[in-house]
Design a protein with these regions (language model features):
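N-terminal accessory/targeting segments that precede structured cores
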Residues: 1-188, 214-236, 469-470, 474-477, ...
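Core structural elements
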Residues: 119, 183-186, 283-288, 453
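ATP-dependent phospho-/nucleotidyl transfer catalytic cores
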Residues: 136, 143-150, 162, 210-215, ...
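Glycine-rich ATP phosphate-binding loop
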Residues: 191, 198-206
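Conserved beta3 strand of the Hanks-type protein kinase catalytic N-lobe
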Residues: 192-193, 335
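Hydrophobic residue at the +6 position relative to the catalytic HRD Asp in the kinase catalytic loop
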Residues: 338-342
């Protein structure tokens, strides 16, 4: 039976009206949602700049603060916008959108650090060690940061030295080279000579760098507070303040001088390891004068040395850091290849003690108990030790710490015959990196972060050159001979 034309027309009109009604509703929803999103983003920007208005006027009025804070807040705003849009997306699509946003913003942060340098370079370098907090793509980008800048004019360095000592540079040093050995965002290094003929290197802090760093840290911590509101389990506010403390510590050269003095006392009975002497009479909070150590950088040595010499040096590096950590509880916490030298007689030379870590007796005891807990697979004990060390789950869930403890026990258990050449250990180190990222809601104490930084950095060097070093026996030997 055929449908009459009139009935078909009525049905068509009804269908069209239904489509138009639904379309009108959809458009209305889109407009309403768009206004909601626009309103929330506008409110966010208003809050951000109101917060910035409370900052010291000398800082907030600088073009540098405006540039850095403006870019960081725009980045934070993209995450706020994503969180709003994600309400209307399927979960898998929202996840892909977030991953793409992470990559885009990681590149923006990297570009900002490279452009502005100053304290941002140091913040970025330190931040790259927080692998349990930052998305992997941020760690990837920030790990690339290289702190190299065009040198400051010689005359500027001379003025800095003279202002620190209150007398002409000719009365401080017998000679100081015009060309620097190195130039970075925070300091410049020149070779010089004392009046007794001793060759030294002089690390001179850049003029006005303290104000620059405070500007950078202020912008960074405010932006981190707003990010913390978006991702509270990550504890970004706490991380930003820890990073700020680390950067500020590097600006006080009396701290670094004390670190070197303590380290030299620590290695006094170890002729194979050296650190530069320091000259307090020609050092201040902003100028550090040290012994000029002649040697070869680590990577060129490893690339050109025989297998026997290469493995002997790598074994010495491993032994030295195990001794620093296990025997003394005071260690160099930034062992990248640029801070490691090979001296005459294939001795190990360490430089740049701006970043070190000291274990308190209580912390040291907890680490010793942790090793025992791992060896005996004592999960309950491991959870208690994590809590005692300062591991805190931002979600307030003890089960999270328990899962993390179980993973660490599984990860760190080694058989006595295992060495770095084993493929299995390569997998363990890879798993270790993944494990750190697995628990972003857990606040990890600074000493553990720095310890992880040491092992990851040295582990990368060892794995690249594949030495036959038995870590288990080495650590056990250090524990048995420990002095603490």
């Amino acid at each position: 039976m055929r449908t009459r034309p009139g009935r078909r027309a009525r049905r068509s009109r009804g269908l069209v009206l239904n489509i138009l009604t639904n379309t009108e509703k959809l458009v209305g929803d889109i407009i309403r949602d768009s206004f909601t999103i626009a309103g929330e983003v506008e409110e966010f920007y208003s809050l951000a700049w109101d917060r910035a208005a409370s900052v010291n006027k000398a800082i907030r009025s600088t073009p540098r603060f405006t540039r850095i804070f403006g870019e960081l807040i725009r980045i934070v705003a993209t995450y706020r916008l994503h969180n709003i849009k994600a309400r209307f997306l399927p979960p898998d699509e929202a996840e892909r959108s977030l991953e793409n946003l992470h990559r885009k913003n990681a590149e923006r942060v990297y570009d900002l650090c490279v452009e502005m340098r100053g304290g941002l370079i140091k913040i970025g370098q330190f931040a790259s060690t927080y692998m349990n907090v930052l998305p992997p793509v941020y760690v990837e980008y920030l790990s690339r940061l290289q702190d190299r800048v065009p040198p400051m004019p010689y005359e500027t360095i001379v003025q800095r030295i003279e202002s620190e000592f209150g007398r002409p540079v000719e009365q401080v040093f017998a000679r100081i080279d015009r060309e620097p050995l190195a130039a970075a965002s925070l300091a410049q290094v020149h070779e010089a000579e004392l009046f007794d003929g001793t060759r030294v290197v002089v690390k001179v802090q850049m003029p006005a760098i303290e104000r620059t760093v405070e500007t950078d840290l202020t912008a960074f911590t405010i932006a981190a507070d707003f990010m913390n509101d978006l991702f509270p389990p990550l504890g970004l506010s706490e991380v930003s303040r820890a990073l700020a403390d680390s950067v500020r510590r590097e600006l006080d050269y009396t701290r670094e001088m004390d670190n070197i003095v303590q380290f030299r006392k620590q290695i006094a009975s170890e002729p194979r390891v050296a650190a530069p002497s320091v000259y307090a009479e020609v050092s201040t909070r902003r100028v550090l004068t040290m012994e000029r150590m002649d040697g070869q950088r680590l990577v060129p040595f490893l690339e050109n040395a025989s297998a026997e010499r290469r493995n002997r040096m790598l074994a010495l590096i491993a032994e030295s850091f195990c001794s620093q950590i296990v025997t003394h509880g005071f260690f160099h916490a930034d062992p990248h290849p640029g801070n490691i030298m090979v001296l005459s007689g294939d001795r190990l030379g360490l430089i740049d003690f701006g970043c070190v870590e000291r274990f308190s007796p209580e912390t040291y005891a907890l680490y010793a108990q942790m090793i025992a807990a791992i060896l005996t697979r004592d999960l309950d004990g491991m959870v208690r030790l994590f809590a005692g060390m300062g591991f805190v789950s931002h979600e307030g869930a003890d089960e999270t710490l328990r899962e993390m403890a179980a993973d660490f026990i599984d990860l760190l258990m080694l058989s006595p015959d295992q060495n770095l050449a084993d493929a299995d250990l390569t997998q363990k180190i890879t798993r270790g990196m993944e494990l750190i990222r697995k628990y972003p809601s857990v606040r990890v104490p600074r000493h553990f972060v720095l310890l992880g930084r040491v092992f990851l950095t040295l582990g990368g060097i060892m794995m690249r050159y594949n030495p036959d070093i038995n870590i288990f026996m080495l650590m056990a030997g250090q524990m048995n001979g420990g002095k603490r």
